[in-house]
Amino acid sequence: MGRALVSMVLGATAAATLLIVALWISSEVLITRTYPIAPEVAQAAPAHAVAEGRRLSKLYGCTSCHGADLQGKVYNPNPRLVRNYAPNLTLAAARYSDEQLAQAIRQGVRPSDGRALWGMPAQTLMHLTSEELAMVLAFVRSHSPAGASTPPESAGWRARWAVLTGALDEPRRVARAQATPAMDLGPKLAAGRHIASTVCSECHGSDLGGDDVEGGPDLRAVGAYDAQAFDTLMRTGVPPGGRHLGIMTLVARSDFKVFTQAEVAALYAYLSARAEWLTAAD
């Protein structure tokens, strides 16, 4: 009986070990796979590009991940998920052309080999206009190469499982976002829709209907805000009632403070109209 039990335990241990190895190898194949890279055309930057590029880099979260000096930093230190190192952009700018940087930003792939840039919100940044992208790149190139290269990212078990199940599939998020864009409510609300697509969709989903991965709710909730309450939310992260909204509160205080009054007004006009349309359609 004792020998049989030992054999069973050893057999189960061996089977579990083989399963773990198989899952690790399978996830590594998916993580290191390469993707086709579409050509990008870079636009010449306007005269005011660096100053506006600095503001846009803050608004789009570039400096939140890559650091105020753009020299890179750890932005997800959880070893069970993914230890992400946002790369040193001052070194990347010296190595890549504007067209290649545009490929990384809009397609979420590394120009040198076509591998996925894990954590790069290309599904949101793909909406940048050529002029917006040119200004961001002008700001990046205003920094001389400095600092060290960041270490490669390290995927933990939770991330590997998410890759195997399809929950994490970075480049394909771009295709999914293209297939499910934010609702088009006409030219008068186009400016607000563009802001929602380039800023809000990272956490709230490409169609703004909520995102299970990032945790952002359906922005239909904006229908409960008046213009003043929404302005307060965007600038302080505090909703009516004073609740702490987690990452929304943090991002509003760190990044959204650079929104112009016109941008907040345009965003509110679009999101409130979207909420009204969805309510009427129910």
Give residue spans per PLM region:
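Solvent-exposed, polar/charged alpha-helical surfaces in well-ordered, non-transmembrane soluble domains
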Residues: 51, 55, 87, 99, ...
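Post-cleavage N-terminal segment of exported redox proteins
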Residues: 1-48, 104-113, 131-187, 237-240, ...
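Sec-exported extracytoplasmic/periplasmic mature domains
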Residues: 58-61, 67, 94, 106-110, ...
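Disulfide-stabilized extracellular ectodomain repeats and their linkers
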Residues: 62, 86, 117, 197-200, ...
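C-terminal functional regions that serve as terminal interaction/effector modules
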Residues: 225-281
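Gly/Gly-Pro-rich "capping" loops immediately C-terminal to redox-active cysteine motifs
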Residues: 43, 54, 68-102, 117-129, ...
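Sequence/structural segment immediately N-terminal to covalent heme-attachment motifs in c-type
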Residues: 46-78, 165-173, 184-208
